[in-house]
Structures are given as C-alpha cells and as structure tokens.
Amino acid sequence: MRTLYHNARVYTGAETFSEAFLVEDGRFLAVGTETQMLSLSDADTVRVDLEGGFVCPGFNDSHMHLVGLGHVLDSAQLDRHTGSLSEMLRFLAAYAAQHPSRQGRWLFGRGWNQDYFSDAARLPNRADLDAVSTDYPIQIMRACGHCCVVNSRALALAGITADTTAPAGGAIGMENGQPDGRLYDNAMDLLTPFIPPPDKEELKQMIRLACGVLNSYGVTSAQTDDYCTFRAVNWETYNEAYRELEASGELTVRVNQQANFTTLPALRRFVEEGACGGPGSLLYRIGPLKMLGDGALGARTAHLSRNYADRPDTCGFSLYSAEHLNKMVSYANAHGMQVAIHAIGDACLDRVLDAVELALREHPRDDHRHGVVHCQISRPDQLERLRRLNMHIYAQSVFLDYDNHIVLSRVGPELAASSYSWKTLMEGGLSVSNGSDCPVELPDVMRGVECAVTRCSMDGTGPYLPGEAFTVREALDSYTIRGAEASFEEGFKGRIAPGYLADFTVLDRDPFETEPRSLHTIGVRSAWLGGSCVYEA
C-alpha cells in the first residue's frame, strides 16, 4: 500500500526542507514538494494530512535501559516526590498501602536525588526506610542507578553485616561501625540472590510499558543496556522476550541491545554461541559489548583523577581493574564486536582509552565504532585521544539540567573547564549521538534538545560552557542520524529519504522557529514506525 503524507514541514536530515513524502512497504518511497508527491500518487494512494506539523526522522535514544524503565513504571516512582526526604518517605509509605498485594514482598522505588531534598542534604539511610516498614525488604534506587538504600529487613536477608566485605568496584556505607543501608555500584549485587527475578512474561510486560512511554516522546529506536537490569535473568531470556514481542507485533520500538557482560567467561559463551553474530532483524539486534566503567557524579562514585572538590576524602572508583577491562575489550574487539563503555570520571576515561588503544593495536579495525557512554568529565589531552582513536560518543545532553548545579562544586574549576565537551568532539570529526540513560532521566527528547542548544538547566541555571552548544540541526541530528551511526544503521535509518525505514515523528511546532528556552515545550503529535502510527496524542 502506498501512502502520501502531506501538509507538513519535513526535516529530512538534509540541508533543505520538504513538504510531503510517500511511504510504501514500510519505507520512504519519495520525498519532495506536495506537487511532486501528488504526481507519484494514484487513486489507490492513501492520503494522510499532517495538518502543518513538523516532521523529522523518528528519534533514536542511543543509550538507555528499556527494561529498567519498564521496571520503574511498575514500582514506586520517586522522581516526582523528591522535594524533601520526608515527602519521599510519605509517598513510599502511601504507595505500599495502596498496593497491599505487594506487602510481604520486596518494595522497590527509584528516582530520588538527595540534592533536591529541602529538609536534609544527605542520602537516605536504613533508619529512614525502617520508618516505612521493617516487615518486608525495601530498596530505593537513586536516580543515577549507581547507589541504592535498603532497610534493615533487606540487609538481614542479604546477610550484610559489619563484617561483610564489599566487592571490588563497590562500597557498603557504614555508620558507627554498622551498615547504614547505602550500597554503591557493585555492592548492590550483594542483593541479587535474594530478589526474586521476573519471569519472561513479566519482562515482556515491562517492555510493553516502556515502549509506550518511548513512543509518546517520539522515540522509535532505542539502544538499550538490559542484561544488567536483573542479573539473575540470563541473556537468552531477555532476547526471547523481545523476539516474542516482535513476532506478535507488540514491539513498537526498534531495539539495539547493548549487551552488558562483566566476566570474560560469560562474554566468551555469548560470542561462541553466535549470539552477537549476524544482522538480527529490523526490530531487534545485538549491538556492542556494554560495560560500566565507574559510577556517577551525583553519588560521587565517578572515578576522578583527583579528589572531589566537595568531598576531599574520595575520588570515586572504577568498577573493574585496568587488567580486567583490557581483557574484555580486547576479546570483544578481536571477535568483531563493538564496545560501548560507561565513563563519567576522567580517571575512568583514561582506562577506557587505554583499553581501546591496546585492543586496536593487537587487532586493528578501520571502522570499529567503539564508544564512550556519557563522556562527561574530561581533560584536554583526553579529547585529543578520543579524536585520534575515532571513538563514538554516546552523550546525554539532558544531564545538563541537573549537572549544571553540581559540576563545578563536585570537580572544581580546572576539570569543569573541559568537561561535557561534546561540540568540541563533534567539530573534531567524531560522531556524537544523544540519549537519556532512561530511567536516569525521562526519554524526553525535546528537553534534551533544549539542553544541547542552550547548555542551561530548565530553571535557567547556566549556560555551562556555552561554546559547546549545539545548533538545532546538530541537536536533532544527534537524536536521529547520529544514533543510527552508533549502531551501524545509517544506511537505512535516521533520515527521511528514499529506501530508508519509514520511522518518523510529528511535532506540534518547528524547532528551528522556536525560541531556544522554549524547545522543551514542543509536543509530540504522533510517532510512526515503518509507516504505522504507534502513538497519537
């Protein structure tokens, strides 16, 4: 079936704008003026009036946690109840009371940020959660996902005591010689054996919920790190859940799996069983090896080359030794895998660059597209190394909304002066894609576009390093064609052009004609996947 979409301002990804386009068999057939498209239509052509909307390629969130988003949607969502510690605890107690069927089981919540608490400028602790309940285990995850707090019941279940040794790459919070309920990074894995994992049907429901939210923000493609969401669930089950949803026609987002592995034996089995081989389908593909290099800036676990300016007793930490990271990256590179490694602190970035440089020296590859996820705190010498190694950058411009308030106080003026330098890297020839790291942030693309263009927070704080601001075109491209480049899909996705997948988003206003500080107010009218509407406001 041939369909004509008309009466629109169409940003194709090229320099010029169009008015209309034709779609046939899930792909763009032609793009041009309305007159040109009418000449290619006949009596059987279906016509869709886009009512003057702004059309761009479907948004591509190049790093997020899709299953994690689905899990949050089925848990206590704390992000809108973090104005104070007392408010968050009241909401958590009310949530538990409203879900009596869950009492006696684990109570999960996510989204809090202690920097927003008006009544207590500190992390919650076990005593705070014990006030909600000690009858059942409670775990609340900080927005960043690199720190959680549990109550006494959860600590007892996991056997975490004053004598428990934290695993490498993690930390157990202590107060007066006893665990205070705070667990950082790899220490959170101590809970894994005691949390009942979801079954495949529950995973599928999480994916359905998450896809609906992504579509509502105009997102039609997601590059997702799912395997780490529930460590007790094997990667085969995640893959089966996605492929069954694809087969039933319920997968409304094109997914590229950033395959998270922490050990060489697990990665080796994944590769030897052929899980990372082949192109996959147009809806579900296996992408790079994904690893977490360090923690987060907000929790002060990102690994810096010097101590934190506002916590001189710590510089954060890397989650793995340099030797282990080198082995993982070298194995993946030698077997044709792309790698994407989370690095927020500059000391962690040093390790990532060392590992990639070693791997490419051992097994050179012309178009490896190895990448750094986040790439936030950096030094000028590292920006040059990134360019020399031709790294892909998975940026999250939306992080500036919060980080504008903390980066200078956290890392000091010297490091802050060369951080979040994504425009510099782009001008140096690197491909910079954009994303949300959802559920760390909402997958709100237009909010991310505004942060990229203004370098300001939503409350007006900033601009932070305004010379690093993107143009509107660069910002839109970072959420479309650059995302496709991250996954080697730029030949058929990320543009509105003949032969490309007919994934597009319709906005209610033109970003090129919108005042920069109002970009976040632009709404999504509809989202289309392969020419089929998957969301309509």
Task: Locate predicted features.
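Non-cysteine beta-strand/loop elements that form the S-adenosyl-L-methionine
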Residues: 65, 281-301, 391-401
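Beta-rich accessory regions
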Residues: 530-532
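Acidic (Asp/Glu)-rich catalytic clusters
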Residues: 246-248, 274-281, 365, 386-388
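Conserved catalytic core of nucleotide polymerization and phosphodiester-bond processing enzymes
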Residues: 522
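Divalent metal-binding segments
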Residues: 2-7, 13-272, 291, 296-331, ...
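His/Asp/Glu-enriched, well-ordered alpha-helical/loop segment
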Residues: 330-340, 344-370, 375, 380-384, ...
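Short loop/turn motifs at secondary-structure junctions and domain boundaries
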Residues: 11-15, 281-282, 485, 516-519
